[in-house]
């Protein structure tokens, strides 16, 4: 079953065949369209983006924010990228190492305790595991 799901998602992503009302996407591999497809083109959703890099190009949350009125918090360790992010985007960009973030505290600072989409794009597996260990998914 897992291989069937992986195969389906790979094919959908390759062709970007998700049912969405938009013709343009910004993600490198259609992640933004995938989220919209899974969540039935949800408007006014919320995201937590860990590893945001560029605020628009190849960004997995820009479409959600700009066309579907999503709010969220984007975190990146690179302060230069976050400076650019905060000039280009209306949602919060935070310069911090995601593996050191207290996520409960961060979300409460932005009055956003519900996350529809958790986006993780951190460069190495060990850091990704560290981040996942720091998130209480039961809350």
Q: PLM features: what roles do these ranges have?
A:
Residues 1, 5, 9, 98, ...:
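Extended hydrophobic/Leu-rich segments
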Residues 1-23:
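Membrane-proximal basic amphipathic "stem/tether" segments
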Residues 8, 12, 38, 106:
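Residues that form generic nucleotide/phosphate-binding pockets
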Residues 22-104, 124:
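SAM cofactor-binding core of SAM-dependent methyltransferases
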Residues 40, 90, 108, 133-136:
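A generic structural signal for secondary-structure junctions
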Residues 46, 62-63, 67-71, 110-139:
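Conserved acidic-Pro-Pro-aromatic motif
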């Amino acid at each position: 079953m897992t291989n069937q799901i992986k195969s389906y998602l790979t094919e959908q992503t390759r062709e970007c065949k998700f049912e969405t009302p938009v013709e343009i996407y910004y993600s490198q591999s259609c992640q933004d369209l995938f989220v919209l497809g899974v969540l039935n083109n949800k408007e006014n959703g919320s995201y937590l983006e860990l590893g945001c890099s560029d605020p628009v190009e190849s960004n997995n949350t820009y479409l959600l924010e700009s066309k579907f009125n999503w709010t969220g918090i984007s975190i990146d360790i690179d302060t230069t990228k976050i400076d650019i992010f905060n000039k280009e985007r209306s949602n919060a960009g935070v310069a911090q190492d995601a593996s050191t973030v207290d996520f409960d505290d961060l979300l409460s600072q932005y009055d956003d305790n519900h996350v529809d989409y958790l986006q993780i794009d951190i460069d190495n597996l060990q850091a990704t595991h560290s981040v996942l260990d720091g998130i209480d998914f039961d809350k």
